[in-house]
């Protein structure tokens, strides 16, 4: 590593705890298969004074999705073999069911099951396990759009895949991850941590701010193939090094995961096999983030540079922004986040519907405005 690269990375990494304050965090940079940065700080559990270390287990949340697709591709050369299984799991659907690849590419047309449960009145902090998930999925009658024609981020696409893989193989998903991913990659501490209330080593996710203080986040969701991965920084480093080591193998797992994906009309899709496909600083990037109350993570890979970045926060700071800053430092380019230039508008703000308890937030965007719909928790006196 050159002196200039070392200095840029050291400055960017040392700034993370200041720019993104919270109980703890971790960051790694892998270049040409070599680990340039492996750094942790703060506490994995502030109450017990457990330090955040490279071996601390972390709730990776939706980064799980690429690993679920990795198991899928490892076990089935043609995932379309599972199309009938998808249909069987949507017994009340009144139209043709999506196929397995539609699930893997977030092109299924399904509506997110946890969001649907909240809209039906389920409490945000209530228990949402296997029974609750199956009830929502089994009740699906219609789709948002015809499969393969559009994109919508839906967690149960990957829950369905992991459930189907379990049924097809007769093995639980934790075992499938172990044999298809963790063992070959060398992810020695990685586990399926489906129950989100606690991590087995005591690592805690926090919500709050420096001004208000941080408190342990409350989660009662049961994630599997959609967001159940528990992994350490060292486990994620092993994944990035595996990606680099297999880069020249056309049948290598990550090469298969990052093969170009299109919609039905042939237009390139921005998401496939549990990975976002985008461009940062003029380079093609595959990446994904993870988020749950108290947890934020982000990993990205720039194949043309043989470069990977991993960021993990056990608090709710934007890990994707931190990863972008580290990537910019590694590439030696300025980090210039987009700042909307539209003039103030009366429509910008948050609006509440009293009848439904839903809120809509409008804010500036590069070509106009974005609309975000959020569920507002009930307030008690």
What positions do the PLM features span?
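Secretory-pathway/luminal and periplasmic proteins that interact with or process carbohydrate-rich
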Residues: 36-37, 93-100, 108-116, 184-194, ...
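Active-site-proximal loop and beta-strand segments within enzyme catalytic domains
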Residues: 3, 19-25, 31-34, 43-155, ...
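Solvent-exposed loop/turn segments at secondary-structure junctions
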Residues: 110, 158, 315-317
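Short, conserved clusters of charged catalytic residues that mark active-site
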Residues: 8-12, 85, 160
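Non-cleavable N-terminal signal-anchor transmembrane helices
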Residues: 178, 190, 196-198
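Catalytic loop of the DD-peptidase/beta-lactamase superfamily, centered on the K-T-G motif
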Residues: 1-40, 166-167, 171, 175-179, ...
